[in-house]
Regions:
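C-terminal catalytic/motor cores of large multi-domain enzyme assemblies
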Residues: 1-216
Length: 216
């Protein structure tokens, strides 16, 4: 990553995302999750599961951003393979949710739970953490409000996600308390220019703020 910071022409885009509707849908979906023989929910959706799905959906909507940069060329992909940074002792792994755009939220949730557990136990296969067309780094659980992340070559983007915080925002002329999270997209300018990066981040924001669109 040190080499990436020194050689990749990073630029950064930032947006605030309102979590009101996402939180409501998440609560309803979790309340109706199927139960196993012990009466425990088979899955429990996290905010991060929605973020993975939203990023994959955004890449599907803005396919020119679903790229990597290697050998002085842009490589385009049909599948949206989303890596997710998982902290482990002494470093991190980035297990990849393959074809996340085509998976349901519950599928992503169960798969990510398994991948994260095996990452922390250092039992991932190389094929489970190599590759990927983008990465998500979420430090919100540590109370970090905002940060920028270093691109993991040959990927051309990485999304840094901050904590969901209550803020007063203007809504129809009124100051309303809403939960928002700040997200920063780092882009490799050789493969994803400013306009393209802005389209991708705008699409991501739309899916986060209108999560029903991810269920269509």
């Amino acid at each position: 990553l040190t080499l990436s910071k020194q050689t990749v022409p990073h630029f950064y885009l930032t947006v605030n995302c309102d979590l009101t509707r996402l939180s409501e849908i998440r609560e309803r979906l979790n309340a109706h999750a199927p139960r196993d023989e012990r009466k425990l929910p088979v899955w429990k959706l996290s905010i991060n599961d929605f973020i993975i799905k939203a990023m994959a959906s955004a890449l599907r909507q803005v396919p020119d951003a679903n790229v990597t940069w290697a050998d002085e060329a842009i490589h385009k992909y049909h599948s949206c393979d989303v890596g997710v940074a998982v902290a482990v002792e002494g470093g991190l792994f980035t297990p990849v949710v393959r074809a996340a755009e085509s998976k349901s939220l519950s599928q992503i949730s169960m798969e990510m739970k398994d991948l994260a557990a095996r990452a922390r136990a250092r039992k991932l296969l190389p094929s489970e953490y190599q590759g990927g067309t983008t990465t998500i780094s979420n430090l919100g659980m540590f109370g970090i409000e905002q940060f920028t992340a270093i691109i993991n070559p040959p990927q051309a983007t990485i999304l840094a996600v901050g904590a969901g915080l209550e803020r007063f925002v203007p809504v129809k002329g009124q100051s309303v308390l809403r939960t928002q999270m700040t997200c920063a997209l780092s882009c490799d300018h050789r493969a994803v220019d400013g306009a393209l990066g802005a389209q991708l981040l705008a699409a991501f924001k739309t899916f986060i703020e209108e999560p029903a669109l991810m269920l269509a």
